[in-house]
Amino acid sequence: MEARFTRGKSALLERALVRPRTEVSLSAFALLFSELVQHCQSRVFSVAELQARLAALGRQVGARVLDALVAREKGARRETKVLGALLFVKGAVWKALFGKEADKLEQANDDARTFYIIEREPLINTYISVPKENSTLNCASFTAGIVEAVLTHSGFPAKVTAHWHKGTTLMIKFEEAVIARDRALEGR
């Protein structure tokens, strides 16, 4: 009876609590996400409504992702500049969600408030087949909701939308107050 309690330590007990293993099977994720899309699709009447519902669900996930990342980071500092927050999203958040960094981060030439995160082959759209009548549907609206929540809860309120351009492009449009604060910080 005592023998089962005195064996060598199991690998499970030796894992660190701070950085748990966060890998999820791709097939399990694909199944869960496709069911989520089907569930939302059965309750809406247009592609715009479906994308809005996916974005709303993404915002709920984004708030939790930010909490988890901040709790796990050792010596994490709070970003005060827009570029730092965007690099955090492109790097740490993307790695936590998809296992790699986003492909590109760009700023719009004509607008200081607009930035783009470009993902050539987004994992979120890989296993979703879209019927012809819904050809404008981009399920990356879910990812846009996640990014919007991470930025908003970090103190950088923004509106994030997903578009088809060079793969999938997330267009991030910050509120004017965020850009004004960023310029004031640069002036110090």
UniProtKB/Swiss-Prot annotation:
Superkingdom to which the source organism belongs: Eukaryota
Protein name: Trafficking protein particle complex subunit 5
Positions where Phosphoserine occurs in the chain: S10
Keywords, sorted A to Z: Endoplasmic reticulum, ER-Golgi transport, Golgi apparatus, Phosphoprotein, Transport
Role this protein plays: May play a role in vesicular transport from endoplasmic reticulum to Golgi.
Assembly: Component of the multisubunit TRAPP (transport protein particle) complex, which includes at least TRAPPC2, TRAPPC2L, TRAPPC3, TRAPPC3L, TRAPPC4, TRAPPC5, TRAPPC8, TRAPPC9, TRAPPC10, TRAPPC11 and TRAPPC12.
Pfam families: TRAPP (PF04051)
Keyword Endoplasmic reticulum included in the entry's annotation: yes
Subcellular location(s) of the protein: Golgi apparatus, cis-Golgi network; Endoplasmic reticulum
SUPFAM superfamilies xref list: Ligand-binding domain in the NO signalling and Golgi transport
Sequence similarity: Belongs to the TRAPP small subunits family. BET3 subfamily.
A biological process from GO: vesicle coating
Gene Ontology cellular-component terms listed: cytoplasm; endoplasmic reticulum; TRAPP complex; TRAPPII protein complex; TRAPPIII protein complex
Organism: Mus musculus (Mouse)
